[in-house]
């Protein structure tokens, strides 16, 4: 398990296979408005799965502004975005989105559809397997998402990402490995 320290940890839910409290900092998992470390963070409920939340309940989708950039973190959700979701999220500068598939996370095609709908300037794919999936894991790798986003600029940035204040108008996918 990673040992990290952060000012705030945003979790999609508190299901046993996600939302583990492994680092220090303020832990948020429920919808609401929060102020943490000078940030105003808003979380709202969205179905966790493709059947309106009937299988895994509701997830929390996050948005906040930091260093002049608007962030949206869709975390663990596999539900189609509703019109209301699109209004609440707006056009984020930075979209953090699960792409590995499985029961609670967008697959590559679904994630690409969300990216096209929100038109962010930067996309950070998360919740995918890097290498071979462990036994029993229902998630896949990032490549199906990258294939679905064919023609989009992709940068492999490693474990750290620094964003400039001006991101430009075109979408760039930032793959952290």
Model-derived features: positions:
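Core dinuclear metal-dependent hydrolase active-site scaffold
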Residues: 1-8, 15-17, 24-90, 94, ...
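Proline-aspartate-enriched helix->loop->beta-strand connector
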Residues: 6, 92-96, 108-128
């Amino acid at each position: 398990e990673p040992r990290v320290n952060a000012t705030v940890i945003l979790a999609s839910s508190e299901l046993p296979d996600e939302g583990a409290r492994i680092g220090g900092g303020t832990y948020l998992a429920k919808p609401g408005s929060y102020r943490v470390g000078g940030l105003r963070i808003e979380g709202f409920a969205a179905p966790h799965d493709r059947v309106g939340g009937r299988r895994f309940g509701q997830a929390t989708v996050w948005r906040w502004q930091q260093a002049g950039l608007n962030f949206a973190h869709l975390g663990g959700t596999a539900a189609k975005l509703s019109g209301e979701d699109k209004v609440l999220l707006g056009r984020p500068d930075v979209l953090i989105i699960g792409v590995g598939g499985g029961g609670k996370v967008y697959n590559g095609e679904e994630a690409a559809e969300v990216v096209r709908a929100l038109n962010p300037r930067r996309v950070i794919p998360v919740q995918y397997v890097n290498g071979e999936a462990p036994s029993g894991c229902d998630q896949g790798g990032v490549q199906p998402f990258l294939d679905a986003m064919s023609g989009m600029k992709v940068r492999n940035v490693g474990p750290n990402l620094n964003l400039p204040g001006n991101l430009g108008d075109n979408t760039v996918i930032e793959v952290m490995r």
